[in-house]
Design a protein with these regions (language model features):
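Conserved catalytic region of serine esterases and O-acyltransferases that act on ester linkages
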Residues: 198-266
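Conserved SGNH/GDSL esterase-like catalytic core that processes O-acyl groups on lipids
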Residues: 35-37, 44-121
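Bacterial N-terminal signal peptides
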Residues: 9-17
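Alpha-helical cap/lid subdomain in secreted, periplasmic
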Residues: 92-216, 228
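Boundary at the C-terminal end of the N-terminal hydrophobic targeting segment
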Residues: 19-21
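Structured segments of extracytoplasmic/periplasmic soluble domains
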Residues: 42, 46, 53-64, 94, ...
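Bacterial N-terminal signal peptides that target proteins for export
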Residues: 1-8
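Short hydrophobic segments within beta-strands
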Residues: 39-40, 142
Length: 266
């Protein structure tokens, strides 16, 4: 009964424009990649890496095929996509056969909406997409989330990522919209973890006021969103919960699936 009430609440929030994108995706998820390379920064590598969390969901669903499935990560701490460009060709050309089905591109946290870096985001993702497709690899954009105390970023990031994905004729995975929906419906679930700025004279940790990096719950929600997008199936009921409280993981699974339904089908 509680799950049904939450479902109705989430659908209601989505229908009135909470956690939605003004720009609609033109590419629908229709295939299931087996070999996925994530390219990004700390948003992707925090909490043992998004690639491991998605892999564990796939294994939990009984869909992992040893020898066929491969999920890997290429990250630069604090990096932007343009900093990855030089390393892409040698990475893709060190084998006679195609190594990846999909390359997931994750830009710096506010890069797509920053006056300074927006064009860099566009140009870099354009260039990486060309390099990837020359090797038969499809680019996918990783829509990131707003900073915890700057909710206006949600709409801006959603539109920037979706517009660029449409331009590239590529899939975009709406992780940022799932974060926004979770914050609306389950604010007790902490999706962020503070960054340490330094230490005071007594050795106590000093934290940055800007909350942007994902907690384990945040990374798990992102992983559920990728599972839903890559398999076009709900992660609800999967046994892998990343050591989160069971009820919390179930909510995040449900939020990911509802975000999927609204973003791609709404």
């Amino acid at each position: 009964m509680k799950n049904r009430v939450l479902s109705l609440l989430l659908v209601g929030l989505l229908s009135v424009g909470v956690a939605t994108a003004a720009v609609k995706p033109e590419v629908q998820p229709v295939s299931t990649p087996k070999r996925v390379l994530f390219v990004g920064n700390s948003f992707s590598y925090y909490n043992n890496g998004i690639q491991n969390r998605v892999s564990n969901l796939i294994k939990s669903a009984g869909k992992w095929q040893a020898g066929d499935n491969r999920y890997r990560l290429k990250t630069i701490s604090g990096g932007k996509l343009f900093e990855h460009i030089a390393g892409i060709p040698p990475l893709l050309q060190n084998s006679q056969k195609r190594q990846w089905d999909v390359m997931v591109l994750q830009e710096y946290s506010d890069g797509p909406i920053s006056k300074k870096y927006h064009q860099s985001f566009v140009d870099s993702s354009d260039e990486i997409a060309i390099l990837a497709r020359k090797q038969g690899i499809e680019p996918v954009l990783f829509m990131t989330w707003a900073y915890k105390n700057d909710k206006d970023m949600t709409q801006q990031l959603a539109d920037a990522y979706t517009a660029q994905a449409n331009k590239l004729n590529a899939l975009v995975v709406p992780v940022g919209l799932a974060f926004a929906l979770a914050a609306q419906t389950n604010p007790e679930i902490e999706l962020y973890i503070p960054d340490i700025d330094g230490f005071n004279e007594t050795g106590q940790e000093q934290y940055n006021d800007v909350l942007k990096h994902p907690s384990v719950a945040g990374t798990y929600l992102a992983a559920c969103m990728f599972y839903a997008s890559f398999y076009q199936q709900s992660p609800e009921g999967l046994a892998y919960i990343a050591d989160l409280p069971s009820a919390e993981a179930k909510r995040l699974q449900q939020i990911a699936w509802l975000t999927f339904q609204q973003f791609y089908k709404g």
